[in-house]
Regions:
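A short, proline-enriched helix->beta-strand linker immediately N-terminal to the Walker B motif
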Residues: 46-50
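Walker B catalytic motif
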Residues: 27, 56-57
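Conserved ABC ATPase "signature" region
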Residues: 5-22, 131
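Conserved ABC ATPase signature
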Residues: 27-31, 35
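P-loop NTP-binding/switch modules centered on Walker-like glycine-rich loops
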Residues: 57, 61, 65-140
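Short catalytic/signature loops enriched in Gly
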Residues: 114-178
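Hydrophobic anchor residue at the start of the ABC signature
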Residues: 41, 53, 69
Length: 178
């Protein structure tokens, strides 16, 4: 693609991400954090992919800009049928954007399932710890395990990575199965 077709395609992408064609002549130093993120989204969609990997896409943005970017991603997902693999440490963001969630601990999969199920009925203790660290706790309920209790150490060669700190360890099952 060259010349006027290229410019037209870029202008269309900029409109999709709620920026005007006049952004084509701007330098990065002239853009806010949210505008830079929208440009990154436009670039990701330029090749019209079926799947986009979003790695910490909202991590450096303030809450209002995060909401705008998530709203944009949701709109584009519905409009273009794109699938996202969304990597984030921010569980509120994950909950807002995801249909399915996979929880990793020390690089190993602990839990995977529909977002609603994972958040309402976590089946792995580490998932419970993560959710408990974000949601408002009930002051009358003492958590069995809190995020501060988790000390990073080398994961075991086999079995669940969380077995050394888990309050619900199931003997050989947790020691031998992932």
């Amino acid at each position: 693609m060259t010349g006027s077709k290229l410019k037209s395609s870029i202008a269309e992408l900029l409109e999709k991400v709620r920026l005007g064609a006049f952004y084509m002549s701007r330098y990065p130093r002239q853009l806010s954090g949210g505008e830079k993120q929208r440009i990154a989204v436009a670039r990701a969609f330029a090749a019209r992919p079926d799947i986009i990997l979003c790695d910490e896409v909202t991590s450096a943005l303030d809450v209002s800009v995060q909401a705008a970017v998530l709203d944009l991603l949701q709109k584009l997902k519905e409009e273009l049928g794109t699938t996202y693999v969304f990597v984030s440490h921010d569980l509120a963001v994950v909950k807002a954007i995801s249909d399915r969630v996979a929880v990793l601990y020390q690089g190993r999969l602990c839990e995977i399932g529909p977002s609603k199920d994972v958040y309402q009925f976590p089946s792995h203790p580490y998932t419970e710890v993560l959710i408990g660290a974000v949601l408002e706790p009930d002051p009358d309920i003492k958590p069995k395990l809190v995020a501060e209790d988790i000390v990073e150490e080398k994961p075991p060669e086999i079995g669940c990575s969380f077995q050394g700190r888990c309050p619900r360890i199931i003997g050989d099952k947790c020691r031998n199965e992932t």
